Design a protein with these regions (language model features):
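Intrinsic-disorder/low-complexity detector
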Residues: 1-68
Length: 68
């Protein structure tokens, strides 16, 4: 699986950080909001690590949604 594909664990982690959401590992194998949402209980250790990597990377960049 490519890290930066829309819906990937990395992408979902970065998006959760961007929108100021809590860390809640998940991903969408068929693209964001397409098909089934895979939650942490069903993710591999590598998928969970990719989610946290995306979240942490966005936190380091400080790239957040401006709601104003």
């Amino acid at each position: 699986m490519k890290k930066y594909v829309h819906g990937s664990p990395y992408d979902r982690g970065a998006a959760d950080s961007y929108y100021h959401r809590a860390r809640e590992p998940h991903w969408y194998p068929n693209g964001t909001y397409n098909g089934e949402r895979v939650t942490e209980e069903r993710m591999t250790d590598a998928e969970i690590a990719d989610y946290h990597l995306g979240f942490s990377h966005n936190e380091q960049m400080g790239n957040y949604k401006d709601w104003n």
